[in-house]
Amino acid sequence: MHKINCGSAIGASSIALALAVSLRLIYNDLDMFKRIALKYLRCWAQKEERKPLVLRGARQVGKTTLVRLFAEEFEHYIYLNLEEKENAALFAADSSFEDLLSGVFFKANVRQDSKRVLIFIDEIQNEPKAVQALRYFYEKRPDLYVIAAGSLLESLMGRHISFPVGRVEYMALHPCTFVEFLDAIGEEQLACRVEQIAVPQSLHDYTLDLFKKYMIIGGLPEVVANYAEHRDMVRLGGVFNALLSGYRDDVEKYASKPKEQDTIRYILNYGWTFAAHRIQFAKFTNTSFRSADVSNAFRILEKTLLLELVYPQTSASFPILPDLRKSPKLLWLDTGLVNYVAGMQEELLFTTDSDELWNGDIAEHIVAQELLGATTSFGEKRMFWVRDARNSQAEVDFLIRYKSHLLPIEVKTGSNSKLRSLHQFMDESRESMALRLWNGPMTSDTIARADGSTFTLYNIPLYYAGQLSEFVGGKL
């Protein structure tokens, strides 16, 4: 592969060599737990009707590194970072697409008739005309492999950028999953077992302990790579601090008004402790911020993909219609960040109360992260169910949609755990199965409904949270 980085200056050879070796080591580490995304990229590249691909994801989920790894499979790689003015100028000029293409290939010293050329347009939000150009890559040069990404793409889309409808496709990139975490720390065989839902009972406690570490550390690639190399959670503090500083330093890019910036900063400083909780904008942390200001700040942060506000489903059947009048549940990008900011890592690491550990908000939050990480489709929303009838309130942690089925998921451990809300959901539903994630082994129970009919309750180890669609598909 001939790699041309149009956004890098040439320095002393010794420094360049050291940097290249360093980056290669980092990329090798990240490759271990981004192989799922690499599989998707390979499928995209093999499509006959291939469209330019837009990578969507929050900052620091590994978009740029992923594409660089993918580029190893191409003969030529052209990297255009539009944070650099000379690269942005290629697209900003009022010239034809043909002239633009000539400039890109000339700058990269690559012939236009070369085979298997991957062009990566990074930080594309810096030049709106580059977004418009994606249409012409699709219409005039479908032989080229074009990927675009941007660290603040989501927050800027609503203001400046409109992607060409029907001429691009999207891929979501999330923090690494438990399977990818296992790959990263050298547990490839166990990763395959988890992926295949085939962990033997003799490895149950060992796998659950690793899932606990994953729940504490989270899945941000830089954090996982650091832990994989050093196996030292204390060292991760500096990594988390740097990541948080980056998110907070971007506030001015998220919003231009001082009031918006102040509210966003407040949420980024104190909102982590409300992870997996339902929140009310009017009473959020008892501050003086107006409800409308808090709501707007959360919407802005949601566009950056740092968090998601999940509104409840109130029906136990289709259609899926989240009730926007009810309080949403707050889910952050990464459970490791939540633990670090809330100062909970040590407590979680050394707790001896298994039921308290696995029945808490953090267990629910890591399950939410796994449910989202199981898909590369952009725009997927997590779901939960509430029943607010007078004298009969209930809440099911999550719902999962599989084809024409809408199934409840409860995160609740202990052999004597009460599942009252799940039973209420199933009394209103005609589904034949329900799911409980717990710290015990894989089992199932036949449960009678109030009307005398029955359903099967599957008790599933927590470490299979990312494989629930495959599990359900094997049962229905």
Identify the role of each PLM range.
Residues V367, L371, V396-S415, A434:
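Conserved catalytic cores of phosphodiester-cleaving nucleases, focusing on short active-site segments
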Residues K63:
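Conserved lysine of the Walker
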Residues M157-F274:
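Interdomain motor-coupling "hinge/lid" segment immediately C-terminal to the ATP-binding subdomain
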Residues A228-E395, I400:
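Accessory nucleic acid-recognition modules appended to NTPase machines
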Residues E84-S114:
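Short glycine-rich substrate-engagement loop in P-loop NTPases that contacts/grips substrate
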Residues M442-L476:
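Domain-level recognition of nuclease-like catalytic cores that cleave nucleotide substrates
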Residues F33-K47:
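Pre-Walker A adenine-sensing motif
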Residues L66, F70:
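Hydrophobic positions on the alpha1 helix immediately C-terminal to the Walker A/P-loop
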